[in-house]
């Protein structure tokens, strides 16, 4: 929209219908202990590019949140192991190899001990529902069509249960693939949902 593009946004249900509210959405370049393995598989240069792209995305989130009036907080991210300190040390070395300012650290506030942990400052958290609502509020209402399911794709034609949409470009922004192409990811992925309970008077973990 900022670039002046004409667009249409469709959703098979309600916008933000599956987004968790009042949660801590984590925005980080630290996606588990993956960097040592990425260097082995793809090399240092490509792994550094991956890390820098994720770091740039954090900055972009800050910029968008400022623009739409959504709160965002700086936070540190941690990767830890309860029983494999060597794995964490290798991850720490890999992060330094690609230029990340990581440090070996404990995990304060956990109700259990850890063998080792890597801490990376400059990450962020926000409320994803608040963010999505703020972004949607900047869009013209007549370009948003809820309860409109995409049933099939033919080039840049999107066939819905309410008619056909033609566009120069189509962006499929679903968490789960809706077309059976591009690597057959629908065969490799599965959906997962987790829950958290806050209990009063329960024994400590």
Annotate each PLM feature.
Residues 2-22:
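Glycine-rich FAD pyrophosphate-binding loop
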Residues 3, 98, 138:
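Conserved dinucleotide-binding and phosphotransfer motif residues
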Residues 5-7, 102, 170:
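Hydrophobic anchor at the start of a short beta-strand
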Residues 22-53:
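Glycine-rich active-site loop/strand segments that organize a redox cofactor
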Residues 33-40, 62-134:
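Flavin (FAD/FMN) cofactor-binding and adjacent substrate-gating region
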Residues 45, 49-63, 90:
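A non-catalytic, amphipathic alpha-helix used as a structural packing/dimerization or gating element
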Residues 92-95, 117-169, 173:
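Helical element adjacent to the flavin cofactor pocket in flavoenzyme catalytic cores
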Residues 163-204:
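Central helical "cap/lid" subdomain
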